Amino acid sequence: MQTIAIKDFIDIKYIKQDQISEIIISRPQVLNAFRPRTINEIIAAFYDSREDSSIGVVILSGHGSRAFCVGGDQKIRSKTGYIDEKGRSSLNVLELQRIIRTFPKPVIAKVSGYAVGGGQILNMMCDLTIASENAVLGQSGPKVGSFDAGYGSAYMARIIGQKKARELWFTCYQYDAFEAYKMGLVNWVVKIEDLDSYAIKLATDILNKSPLAIRFLKSSLNADCDGQSGLQELAGYSTMLFYMSAEGQEGHRAFLENREPDFSKFNS
């Protein structure tokens, strides 16, 4: 079947083929970092896939082999969030996290290269993850004056354990694909040249199963962490307040100035 471009998006590519849709974050010039428009386009693509009864599985990926996504574009971050094209502050990635989490069809992350910061959290929100051998995963928030105290930390702790989640967040270390596999952040590690074909095979295997059974199973598996949705909303507000603080701004400025942040004056 011919691959069909559904929308004329700017920041993403969206294709449908053989009951599978793929949403590709396409900002390779910034390692697929997202801005508010990027997130709005991804959300629109998810809505389209949800309403299209011919689609049974969604794949989320990044353009090229250098990066899946490195989180929010720090160059457009303000004191209260990320600036959209109308000059408004936004943290709409939190809405995207909820959409992926509750999406009635399986969502597969196809990770090549860097998946760090908010990009790693998007990977984590997907139901399953296939990573290529060159994948690098980790968190970066505390280095740049940011954090995710919702799904990004609470759900992470549920997946990889409290100690390991604290390690990721407190140190901002980065981990290769095999280390991420051992932690439980990815399900499979494959050669980079096999990544696309493996993702299609996995999606096809899922399509051969009962869609209603899988939908119910996803809801049941999510139920264990349902309380985290309220925590995520509260955490979103606290993140915006933190961006306004001197400490949050120091991390952001240090990133833009390509220097190490000096958080020593904020120790108490």
Curated annotation (Swiss-Prot):
Pathway in which this enzyme or protein is active:
Quinol/quinone metabolism; 1,4-dihydroxy-2-naphthoate biosynthesis; 1,4-dihydroxy-2-naphthoate from chorismate: step 6/7; Quinol/quinone metabolism; menaquinone biosynthesis
**E.C. numbers:** 4.1.3.36
Task: Give GO terms for biological process.
Answer: menaquinone biosynthetic process
**Where does it localize?**
Plastid, Chloroplast
Q: How is the cofactor bound?
A: The hydrogencarbonate anion plays the same catalytic role (proton acceptor) as the side-chain carboxylate group of the essential 'Asp-185' found in actinobacteria, archaea, bacteroidetes, and deltaproteobacteria.
Extract the Gene3D superfamilies matched here.
2-enoyl-CoA Hydratase, Chain A, domain 1, Lyase 2-enoyl-coa Hydratase, Chain A, domain 2
> What PANTHER family does the database record attribute to this sequence?
1,4-DIHYDROXY-2-NAPHTHOYL-COA SYNTHASE, PEROXISOMAL (PTHR43113:SF1), NUCLEOSIDE-DIPHOSPHATE-SUGAR EPIMERASE (PTHR43113)
- Its name, as the record gives it, is 1,4-dihydroxy-2-naphthoyl-CoA synthase
Species of provenance: Cyanidium caldarium (Red alga)
